[in-house]
């Protein structure tokens, strides 16, 4: 999507790109090396775009959520709901609306304020997997 919109933002001399990464891009975990690498790349790509467009009034933000209760774990574990449920044991996982609230917070800052990144975790989460 950024590829499609960035040229228009440059032409208009304004815009805001908000990319969704993951704490897995900060804290890798077993069995997810490729996923962690791609999420790390989201942050680096965002930083690069911010640098490349610094004179164009384009903000670039990376949101890096931790454990969010979605279908992600069921997909990861090929439909094994019991195994997927273990991911959330003992953690009051983030919900999609928590990420949406952070996105709105970032998007609604004054023109002179750029939030480069936010890492969002559940209260009982310390890394991408605990």
Regions found by a protein language model. Name each.
Residues 73-82:
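Short, flexible, mixed-charge acidic loops at enzyme active sites
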Residues 59-69:
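Conserved SDR Rossmann-fold cofactor-binding beta-strand/turn motif
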Residues 2, 38:
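Active-site helix of classical SDR
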Residues 29-33:
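Active-site loop immediately N-terminal to the catalytic Tyr-X3-Lys motif
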Residues 4, 8-9, 27, 48-58:
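Active-site-adjacent segment of SDR/Rossmann-fold oxidoreductases
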Residues 22:
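Residue(s) in the substrate-gating loop at a strand-loop-helix junction
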